[in-house]
Design a protein with these regions (language model features):
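Nucleic-acid endonuclease domains
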Residues: 1-104, 109-268
């Protein structure tokens, strides 16, 4: 069997037997281009530019993505506190990705597309059980799926506070390095932690029309109920802007997810 494979490779690809044997022993890596791969490749890119140790395994890095990101980051680093990076600590799976001089911290976020959304650390996509525990409802709701309408009612009644918690956990570091459109042509957005908190105090906030109440729409084609989602807005009339999106997942991972729209974080 092995001989037939070697012969097929040499005949098809016009390579030597030695090259064919090497290809069998070490097939080329195939990258999934997932959000995780992009994020780890971006972290590797920052480490490469700053000449610091990277703890990410080589087989988890997409070299093409890393080099593409290095290309847009290199002319940027001399103008920002990025040049003060001392070490990469993202491998700890905490809120901080890089430690800077003077005790400052940096978080790295990547988006596959330019119109992506950013999920807060720690509280952005908890399971139903974790959500209930965090917001003090576990004794009442017990992490059960059928109580999603109660969870959404709580969010609506405490929306300003809820969004402030989400915002605090998005800017849990002194700086946020945001790299959108990594799937094609990445760009660089360097955001500083807001000087004034809480941000959401008395703004007019609203949900997408027709999505103000929790409901699961029946999908006739799929013969099942759809997951509920709704967008939250700030302002009125022409000043109305998207803030973020809530999603209630009920599949293999049952969770309450919230993500900020990129344009809100970069402009608010």
């Amino acid at each position: 069997m092995r001989e037939r494979v070697i012969k097929a490779i040499t005949n098809t690809l016009k390579v030597t037997r030695e090259e064919a044997e090497t290809m069998i022993k070490k097939p080329p890596r195939v990258y999934s281009n997932s959000n995780e791969t992009i994020g780890q490749s971006a972290e590797h890119a920052v480490c490469s530019i700053m000449n610091i140790h990277c703890s990410i395994a080589e087989d988890r890095i997409d070299d093409a993505i890393s080099k593409k990101i290095q290309g847009v980051l290199t002319p940027f680093v001399d103008k920002t506190p990025l040049c003060d990076i001392e070490s990469s600590i993202g491998f700890r799976n905490g809120a901080v990705d890089f430690q800077l001089k003077g005790g400052k911290t940096l978080s790295l976020k990547t988006l596959k597309r330019s119109d992506g959304k950013i999920c807060p650390q720690n509280v952005g996509q908890p399971t139903l059980k974790k959500w209930d525990e965090h917001w003090g409802f576990y004794q009442e709701l017990e992490g059960k799926l059928e109580h999603n309408s109660k969870r959404f009612d709580y969010i609506k009644s405490n929306l300003h506070h809820y969004l402030n918690v989400m915002l605090d956990n998005t800017f849990c570091c002194d700086y946020l390095l945001l790299l959108p459109n990594c799937d094609k042509t990445p760009s660089v957005e360097f955001l500083k932690k807001p000087p004034i908190t809480p941000f959401f105090v008395d703004q007019t906030l609203s949900f997408k029309e027709g999505r103000e109440t929790y409901f699961e729409r029946w999908d006739e084609k799929k013969q099942k109920y759809c997951e509920f989602s709704s967008t939250v807005y700030m302002g009125q009339g022409e000043e109305k802007k998207r803030v973020g999106e809530f999603q209630f997942h009920k599949g293999s991972r049952k969770e309450v997810k919230f993500r900020f729209y990129r344009e809100f974080l970069t402009n608010y």
